[in-house]
């Protein structure tokens, strides 16, 4: 499966691949057929226990794509929620006889950038977030990585182009883009690894001691992968997209 994202007439995410690689099992990356789609519009207001505002509006259009992998008979759903200021999407696995307990070896969620954006980033590290932010073009991350890493008692970098979420970017034509996640429950946190030749980020999950990324039992779902976008930098701070996707 693939997806793409635009903001008005501007491309935010070029066609990007989705899928999960399973440990010692058939991967959930390709060979799917579309079984059904469901759409809905949701609009409600809720009140947080505390926060900057009394009322928060949760307004989105949703698309649920139900997929089936004929070679295995397995089912995987992709749920997208589109807001005025971005999108959230996740993988879902309904109850089914051919997929009950499974181990995620890798998540191959891609974010193909439409240009060599300016980015504000922290070096990807399994053990610490105690680094200063570095500002650079995406293509400069590799060259600036060594200087972005300061001494720390616990450090495990995973790639010379790996960065942490949330990742904030700005395009040359004035769009602000943020990649992050929401509803992180019983799953590994997501970093991003950059293919700096093609300017494609891919999810990079923190492994456990034996290298696995998640242990799941259907029915199950992954965290939301979020992309916020606006032509106003202030909207990045004002957005409630991630709050709305963090279900109680």
Labelled PLM ranges:
Residues 1-247:
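N-terminal accessory beta-strand-rich subdomains and adjacent acidic, glycine-rich linkers
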């Amino acid at each position: 499966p693939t997806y793409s994202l635009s903001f008005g007439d501007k491309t935010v995410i070029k066609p990007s691949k989705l899928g999960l690689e399973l440990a010692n099992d058939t991967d959930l990356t390709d060979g799917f057929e579309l079984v059904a789609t469901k759409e809905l519009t949701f609009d409600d207001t809720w009140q947080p226990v505390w926060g900057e505002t009394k009322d928060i509006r949760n307004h989105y259009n949703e698309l649920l794509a139900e997929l089936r992998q004929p070679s295995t008979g397995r089912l995987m759903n992709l749920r997208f929620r589109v807001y005025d200021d971005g999108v959230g999407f996740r993988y879902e696995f309904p109850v089914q006889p051919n997929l009950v307990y499974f181990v995620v070896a890798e998540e191959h969620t891609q974010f193909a950038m439409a240009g060599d954006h300016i980015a504000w980033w922290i070096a990807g590290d399994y053990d610490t977030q105690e680094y200063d932010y570095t500002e650079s073009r995406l293509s400069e991350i590799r060259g600036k990585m060594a200087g972005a890493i300061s001494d720390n008692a616990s450090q495990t970098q995973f790639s010379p182009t790996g960065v942490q979420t949330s990742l904030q970017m700005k395009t040359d034509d004035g769009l602000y883009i943020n990649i992050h996640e929401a509803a992180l429950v019983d799953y590994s946190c997501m970093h991003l690894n950059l293919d700096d030749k093609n300017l494609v980020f891919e999810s990079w999950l923190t492994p456990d001691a034996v290298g696995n990324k998640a242990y799941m039992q259907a029915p199950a779902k992954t965290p939301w992968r979020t992309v916020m976008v606006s032509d106003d930098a202030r909207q990045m701070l004002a957005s409630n997209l991630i709050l709305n996707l963090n279900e109680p």
